[in-house]
Design a protein with these regions (language model features):
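Structured C-terminal subdomain patch of bacterial secreted/periplasmic proteins
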Residues: 113, 136-137, 141-146, 155, ...
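Proline-aspartate-enriched helix->loop->beta-strand connector
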Residues: 46, 93-107, 123, 225-240
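A short, structured surface patch at a secondary-structure boundary
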Residues: 48-110, 207-210
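Bacterial Sec-exported substrate-binding components of ABC uptake systems
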Residues: 2-5, 17-55, 152-183, 293-298
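Extracytoplasmic ligand-binding site segments that recognize negatively charged/polar headgroups
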Residues: 128-143, 147, 176-201, 245-247
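Short helix-initiation/N-cap motifs at beta->coil->alpha
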Residues: 35-37, 85-95, 215-226
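His/Asp/Glu-enriched short active-site or ligand-binding loop at hydrolase and phosphoryl-transfer sites
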Residues: 195-220, 271
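Flexible loop/hinge segments that line or gate small-molecule binding clefts
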Residues: 75-80, 112-143, 147, 151
Length: 298
C-alpha cells in the first residue's frame, strides 16, 4: 500500500511539475527591461519570439528560451536547428515580421526605425546592440533571461562565462602577456582596434594591438597595408576571415614577405570561426580559450 502511494505521489508530482514551472514563470511578469530603446515592459511571458540578431539568437537559446523562439533572421546560424527564415536584421520588413504574430522581437540595430514601427502596431521590441565590452554582453544575457522568464538559467550562463574567462586569462603567463596581435577581418587587411568589443578581449590578455596606431579616423576598424603589418611583425595573427574567405595559416605564410613575421615563424597564426569572432554571446569564451592557447606557444 505504501509503495503504491509513493508511486501515485511521484506520478502526480510529474504531472504537476510543468504546471508549477509555468506558474512560476508567469508570476515573474510583468517585468521592465532597461534596454537600449528605453524601459520596455514585457507584460506576460513571451511564447512567440522573433530574433533578428545572431547574437540575440545565441543568447536566447543559451538562457533556455529556445522553445519560445518561433523565427530568427537569415544570419542566425547557431545553435544548430534554429528556426531560420528569410527575415533580415539589416533590411527589416515590418509586415513580414508582423505576419508571424510575435509577442517579442529582439533586434541589435534600429535600422529604418524598425523599433518604433513594430511598437506602433503593438509588438514589444528589445534593442540589444553590439556590446562594447564583456560587462555589456553579460547584461544583455541577463536582460533576455528576465524578458523571457528564464532568470535562473541566464544567471547560470553569465556566472559560467565569468568563471571561464577568469580561468582562461590566468592561463597565460605574465611573460607572454605583452605580445602584439593583428586581427584580420578580411584579406584586404581590415582590422579591429582596442576600442572594439573583440579588441577589448585582446586587451584583457594584455596584448598590444597593431591596428591601434593606424586608426587615424578612430573608426575602430582601420584598413591596414601589407607593408605595415609586415613591418609590425605581430606575435599573434588571428584570422577572422577563415570561413568567408578561406584564409589559413598556410595562406598567410604564402603572402609575399609574410614568412618573416613573428607569428608565422613561431606558429602563432590561428584561424577562427568568423561568426564566433564577430558576436558577443556565450561563445566568446571559446574564442578567448583559442587565443589563450596560441598565446602560450613558445
Amino acid at each position: 500500500m505504501l509503495r503504491r502511494s509513493l508511486v501515485l505521489f511521484a506520478a502526480l508530482a510529474a504531472i504537476l511539475a510543468p504546471s508549477a514551472a509555468a506558474t512560476r514563470h508567469a508570476s515573474a511578469f510583468p517585468v521592465t527591461i532597461h534596454a537600449a530603446n528605453g524601459d520596455v515592459v514585457v507584460k506576460t511571458r513571451p511564447t512567440r519570439i522573433i530574433s533578428l540578431s545572431p547574437t540575440g539568437t545565441e543568447d536566447l537559446f543559451a538562457v533556455g528560451a529556445g522553445s519560445q523562439v518561433i523565427a530568427v533572421d537569415n544570419d542566425s546560424d547557431y545553435p544548430k536547428g534554429v528556426p531560420s527564415t528569410s527575415l533580415s536584421g539589416y533590411t527589416p520588413n515590418v509586415e513580414a515580421i508582423a505576419g508571424y504574430k510575435p509577442d517579442l522581437v529582439v533586434v541589435s540595430n534600429d535600422i529604418d526605425n524598425v523599433v518604433a514601427s513594430l511598437q506602433k502596431i503593438g509588438i514589444t521590441v528589445l534593442l540589444e546592440p553590439a556590446a562594447d565590452n564583456l560587462a555589456q554582453a553579460y547584461d544583455e544575457i541577463r536582460q533576455l533571461g528576465s524578458a523571457t522568464g528564464n532568470v535562473p538559467q541566464a544567471t547560470k550562463v553569465v556566472s559560467g562565462m565569468e568563471k571561464a574567462m577568469t580561468k582562461i586569462l590566468r592561463s597565460v603567463p605574465k611573460a607572454q602577456r605583452h605580445q602584439t596581435v593583428y586581427h584580420e577581418l578580411d584579406p584586404t587587411y581590415y582590422s579591429a582596434t582596442s576600442s572594439t568589443f573583440i579588441g577589448r578581449i585582446y586587451k584583457l590578455f594584455g596584448f598590444k594591438n597593431i591596428a591601434d596606431a593606424a586608426d587615424t579616423t578612430h573608426s575602430g576598424y582601420p584598413q591596414l597595408s601589407a607593408e605595415y603589418i609586415v613591418a609590425s611583425s605581430p606575435d599573434i595573427v588571428v584570422l577572422a576571415d577563415s570561413v568567408c574567405c578561406a584564409q589559413t595559416a598556410a595562406s598567410v605564410a604564402a603572402r609575399p614577405g609574410w614568412s618573416g613575421i613573428s607569428a608565422v615563424k613561431h606558429h602563432r597564426v590561428i584561424a577562427v570561426n568568423d561568426s564566433v569572432a564577430s558576436r558577443w554571446g556565450p561563445r566568446i569564451v571559446d574564442f578567448a580559450r583559442a587565443i589563450a592557447a596560441v598565446a602560450r606557444k613558445k
